[in-house]
Each structure stands twice: as C-alpha cells, then as structure tokens.
C-alpha cells in the first residue's frame, strides 16, 4: 500500500541481491526514493550524483568475511565524503562490540539481519528525521552567520527613512542609555 506521506531518499548497499529486492519492495512504501547498490565500490560516486538522507550499509561484502571491517571502512569513507548523510549499519554477524564500534565511528544506528520489518522501518524513519533536523540546523546556522557578518541584512529596506533609523539605532546602541 502506497503512503501519501513518503519522504526521504534512502540508499541501500548490500551484496545480496535478494535482500536488496526485499528491502526495496518493503521500503518503497515509506520513502520517496529507494536506490540499491550491490557493491560499495560505487558508493561514493553515487553519493556525488545524488543527495541521500540515509544509507543502509551492509557490513560484510567479501565471501567468507564476517568481522564487519568492510562496513566500518565504508562508513569512514562515507563520513568523509558526505558527512550530512546518516548511516545505519546492517549485518547478520552482529555483536555488541561491533555495534559500539559502528556507533563510535559515526553510524546513527545498527540493525541486525534478519530484520523485523516494523523495527527496521521505525529505525530508518527516525534516522531520516534526524538527518532532516541536522540539515535544518545547518541551514539556520548559515543564516545566522550571514546576519552576523552583515548586520544591515537584519533590516528591511534601503529607503532614506530606513537608513536614518539604522543610523539612529547604531548611535544609541553605542551608549549606556
């Protein structure tokens, strides 16, 4: 069932094509855009081409490897290339130490395979809201910097009356009155 309130751009990176298909079917009802990659090798170029809010990143890509180091490596690459993107790590070989390493390295959350659909959706939507909030904070900080750099930008108008008023305010502001 399609939802009217779908928001956010999600990128899923996993080497298992069956998982990618299942996740795309599940999450397309909840996110505006769901893109999949079956290898992290194109991750950085994909992020340069399109702005994603959240990346769901598998932690193991090579056959026989299950220690999570590949995911941690790609997490670091992603944090450096696109610090605004929130990352949720995703693995079948989870333990507390690996989850802690991932969170310390900058992941927003950690999900274990096999996943519970409701929990996965809730996690990804929560992380999307975090991403949106952080972008809004950054936008507001930039506006604040602009106002601080150019105090005149706080005033509307360039008429003679407004210029006179600005001069009066600046004169009074320098006094103890």
Protein language model annotation of sequence segments:
Residues 60, 64-83:
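Short amphipathic alpha-helix used as the core "switch/output" element in two-component signaling
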Residues 1-11, 17, 24, 41:
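Non-catalytic signal-transmission and effector/linker regions of two-component phosphorelay proteins
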Residues 31-40, 46, 66-67:
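Short hydrophobic/Thr-rich beta-strand motif most characteristic of the beta2 strand and flanking loop
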Residues 17-35:
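Two-component/phosphorelay signaling modules centered on CheY-like receiver
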Residues 65, 96-97, 118-156:
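Conserved ASCE P-loop NTPase core motifs with emphasis on AAA+ ATPases
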Residues 145-177:
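AAA+ ATPase active-site-proximal loops
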